[in-house]
């Protein structure tokens, strides 16, 4: 780690603002940060709910540098600890971690740092922090502050409940003079109350920030030919970093292989792989050696890669919290990012079937509530951002103009006759076939199974041949959403059945408006590019700065975003700083990073400016 006398000077009499500027390289606080930091410095416990990408980590890292003593950071994931420690060390901060991934020799080195008082921050797992051996070790240090990251893990209402978190309620008794800060990006009201109850927080400062991530565009793509749709979307990203989530290991492997066959740098990641292989995939992704990771939900929590430009869900997540957290791994640098959910009603029905196979317990009721909420989100015809925010108790009325519903509002038509055709066909084939078969009968397809079952002789055979398969898929989905048709998952295949509500439609007793099938929502993305994070930056210089960053990162054996993130490089490409004073005005460039990395970037910028000047003179 860099042992710089400059850092000692910076933190000799630190204030929150001086640490923010000198160590982390930012000129001002983001909304909520300063009040949370001041609460900690005043000795208050705090509950902080702050969206990913809004600077949650700084809320405890800055007080840690202001306090005279050790800060404990309790974190659930080994890879997350290492990633955060790497970033702190890049800023010249004495930080380290203790966990099961280390050798005995490595653990002893950390323990020696603790005993000698070298460390400002120590990251540790929840299962380790409450052990007698850890208390004995920590007795050599003055613990002045405790941060509990991913605090939603303490709550059974949370989407990622971890039993080991429940023992953290004893921290307040063990360290009565140390303020405790519990932080999370995903906690509804019930989860927030659970966190407070378990942790016994006193003299509380509560900050519930906005859950909005305005730089992320939310899009739902109805599945027609899902693998083709996904491939088209990934290829349109033109080499940008992204994560694709699936619900099964087999699907992860198949999609990764299919993308590689299309020329995409893609890797699979799931719990069935050897640990060493998973670690290699994660490292390759962090270091921009792999473009796309196709993963189960196990991937992503352990990294803070800032330049993930898209997250795609090939399957429906089990809760809005999971969806929000997973999509939140995109755009952490505040630059535009895409979140695409590929969906069909069978996805929801399948998750419902799995859930109902569990014993009937209070936990199953919680999971049912969360599953229904994500189903409502997927089927909504209103602004997706408003649905998301409303779930977390943040009520807004103004549509976002940055989701598929806002960019391409559904167009309505009189759908009564179409609905009657679909329902009649479902009824005539015995309510024991799925959507594909019903559509084949509707469209009069010459299908061997249809002929074997004599369904080509039905009165409904071919009554929908004037419209496309995609049209009828859309009609069936909407009838499911509206409750006129239900999809029943059996051990064999999903089947369509009529509900009691279908009678009024079949009899024509009520009007029915349906939405016209939309062209691919993904194609709308291509025609509605998002705003760029920094206006008027030199794109050629930005590309050269990224290449230089990759060279430095590989040499230092760290991920590129730990050197400087994309937003910082865009500012450099706009303002073109060539002196230390100018460089320190760039967000994300602190004194330590300037000392460690600044010179080659300024040299490259100087060279680029000379090239531009020569070109202008020649004109």
From Swiss-Prot:
Where do the annotations place Zn(2+) binding? Answer: 383, 400, 403, 406
Query: Which stretches make up the Helicase C-terminal domain?
Result: 229-374
* GO molecular function (one): metal ion binding
> In this protein, which residues make up the domain named HRDC?
535-615
- Cofactor: how bound: Requires Mg(2+) for helicase activity.
Look up keyword Transmembrane and say if it applies. no
CC cofactor: Mg(2+); Zn(2+)
Amino-acid positions noted as binding ATP in the UniProt annotation, renumbered to this chain:
50-57
- SMART domains on file: DEXDc (SM00487), HELICc (SM00490), HRDC (SM00341), RQC (SM00956)
Give the superkingdom in one word: Bacteria
Keywords of this entry: ATP-binding, DNA damage, DNA recombination, DNA repair, DNA-binding, Helicase, Hydrolase, Isomerase, Metal-binding, Nucleotide-binding, Zinc
**What reaction is this protein's catalytic activity?**
Couples ATP hydrolysis with the unwinding of duplex DNA by translocating in the 3'-5' direction; ATP + H2O = ADP + phosphate + H(+)
Family indicated by similarity: Belongs to the helicase family. RecQ subfamily.
Which named protein is this? ATP-dependent DNA helicase RecQ
Q: Which organism is it from?
A: Haemophilus influenzae (strain ATCC 51907 / DSM 11121 / KW20 / Rd)
**Name of encoding gene:** recQ
